[in-house]
C-alpha cells in the first residue's frame, strides 16, 4: 500500500500531469465555424466506377472527365488529372508536356500486369538447383550475367531520369515506368546473384558504347526509347531467349524466363509509344530512322568486341571446344533472329531502315 501511494504521488508530480493541469486551467480557445467551401469544388461529382473481371483497374478509372487525356498538358504542377488546380502554385518545370512525347495506349494495362506478376530473386529463384559447372562454362555464364547486369543498371538510370520529367496528366505512363524501373533493379540484382552463387564472380565490364548512347540521349524521351527498345532492348530480349534454351539448371531457366516476361512489357510500351509518336508528329518517322542510322556505328563497336560473343558461344556449345562449332552456329542464328525482328519492328513502325554493312550477313536474304 505504501508503494502504491508513493507511485501515485510521483505520477501527480510528473511533467505530463503538470501539462494537463495547465491546459485545464487555461481559457477555452474559440473554435472557428467551419466554412466547408471546399465541399462544392469538383469538376465532376457522382462518379461510380464498378470493378470489372480484373478488379478496379487503373484504366477503368478513365470515365467522364477523368478519362479526358488531352494532347497537351500545360499544367506544370503535381495536380492529379481531373482535380481542380490551386491558383498561384509555382510550376515544377516538367520537360515532357505533350502526349506524343510519352504516351502509349497500353501503359495502364502494362502497369496492372507488372504489379500482379512480381517475383522475388531472393526466394522465388530455385537457387538450390545451381550445381558446380566446368570452369570454362561457369566463367562464360558469369561474364554474360555481368554484362546483363550492366544493361539493367543503364535501364534504371535512363527510366528514372526521364520519368520525373513527365507531367502528371499522363499518370498511366508515369506509373508504368515506375514498375519498369523496379523491374530493371530486380534484373540487376538477379544477374549479379547468378554470377556470385556458384564459385565464380563478376567478369569484365562491357565496352559500353551503346550504354553511353542511351544514357546521353538528350533529344527527348522518344529518342531514348528508340535506343532503349529498338536497339538494346531487342538485343537483350533475343539473348535471354537463347540463354533460356541453353540454361544449365532450373535457376537459370527461371531467371531468364521471368526477366523475359518483364522485358516484354517494356518492349510493348516502347513500340506502342513510338507508333503513337510517329502518328502524331510528321517528322518523327524520319527522326527515328536518323537516330537508328547514328546508333549503328556505336552498336557495331560493341558488336566487334569479342568478349560477349565468345562467352555466349561457350554457353551455347557447352564448352570452349563446343563454342568453335555448334556454339558459334547458335550465336549466328541468334543474331539473325535479332536483325530479322528489328527489321520487322521498323516495318511495323513504317520507319525506313538499311542494315549496316557489318551486319548484312545476318539480314534476311530476299
PLM ranges: what are they?
Residues 2-174, 197, 201, 222-223, ...:
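Terminal targeting/low-complexity segments that flank the catalytic cores of oxidoreductases
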Residues 146-149, 153, 178-181, 185, ...:
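Short amphipathic alpha-helical segments with heptad-repeat character
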Residues 151-159, 187, 232-239, 266:
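Amphipathic, well-ordered alpha-helical segments in soluble domains
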Residues 156-217:
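Long, hydrophobic, well-ordered secondary-structure blocks that form the structural core
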Residues 158-163, 178-179, 237-243, 257, ...:
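A structural feature that tracks compact, well-ordered secondary-structure segments
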Residues 193-267, 293-297:
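Active-site-proximal alpha-helical scaffolds that flank and shape metal-associated catalytic sites
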Residues 274-282:
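C-terminal helix-coil-helix/basic helical segment that borders enzyme active sites and/or dimer interfaces
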Amino acid at each position: 500500500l505504501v508503494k502504491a501511494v508513493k507511485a501515485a504521488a510521483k505520477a501527480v508530480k510528473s511533467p505530463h500531469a503538470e501539462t494537463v493541469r495547465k491546459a485545464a486551467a487555461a481559457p477555452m480557445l474559440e473554435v472557428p465555424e467551419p466554412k466547408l467551401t471546399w465541399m462544392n469544388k469538383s469538376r465532376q461529382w457522382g462518379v461510380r466506377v464498378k470493378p470489372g473481371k480484373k478488379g478496379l483497374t487503373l484504366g477503368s478509372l478513365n470515365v467522364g472527365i477523368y478519362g479526358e487525356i488531352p494532347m497537351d498538358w500545360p499544367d506544370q504542377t503535381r495536380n492529379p488529372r481531373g482535380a481542380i488546380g490551386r491558383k498561384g502554385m509555382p510550376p515544377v518545370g516538367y520537360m515532357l508536356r505533350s502526349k506524343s512525347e510519352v504516351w502509349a495506349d497500353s501503359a495502364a494495362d502494362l502497369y496492372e500486369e507488372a504489379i500482379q506478376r512480381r517475383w522475388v530473386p531472393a526466394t522465388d529463384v530455385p537457387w538450390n538447383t545451381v550445381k558446380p559447372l566446368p570452369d570454362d562454362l561457369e566463367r562464360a555464364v558469369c561474364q554474360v550475367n555481368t554484362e546483363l547486369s550492366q544493361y539493367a543498371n543503364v535501364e534504371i538510370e535512363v527510366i528514372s531520369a526521364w520519368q520525373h520529367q513527365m507531367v502528371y496528366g499522363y499518370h498511366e505512363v508515369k506509373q508504368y515506368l515506375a514498375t519498369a524501373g523496379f523491374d530493371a533493379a530486380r534484373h540487376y540484382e538477379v544477374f549479379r546473384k547468378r554470377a556470385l552463387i556458384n564459385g565464380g564472380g563478376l567478369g569484365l565490364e562491357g565496352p559500353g558504347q551503346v550504354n553511353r548512347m542511351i544514357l546521353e540521349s538528350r533529344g527527348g524521351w522518344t529518342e531514348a526509347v528508340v535506343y532503349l527498345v529498338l536497339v538494346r532492348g531487342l538485343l537483350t530480349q533475343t539473348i535471354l531467349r537463347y540463354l533460356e534454351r541453353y540454361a544449365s539448371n532450373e535457376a537459370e531457366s527461371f531467371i531468364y524466363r521471368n526477366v523475359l516476361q518483364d522485358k516484354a512489357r517494356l518492349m510493348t510500351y516502347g513500340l506502342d509509344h513510338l507508333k503513337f509518336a510517329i502518328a502524331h508528329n510528321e517528322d518523327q518517322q524520319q527522326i527515328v530512322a536518323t537516330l537508328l542510322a547514328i546508333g549503328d556505328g556505336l552498336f557495331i563497336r560493341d558488336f566487334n568486341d569479342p568478349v560477349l560473343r565468345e562467352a555466349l558461344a561457350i554457353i551455347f556449345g557447352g564448352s570452349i571446344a563446343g563454342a568453335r562449332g555448334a556454339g558459334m552456329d547458335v550465336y549466328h542464328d541468334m543474331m539473325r533472329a535479332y536483325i530479322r525482328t528489328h527489321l520487322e519492328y521498323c516495318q511495323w513502325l513504317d520507319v525506313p531502315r538499311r542494315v549496316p554493312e557489318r551486319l548484312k550477313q545476318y539480314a534476311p536474304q530476299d
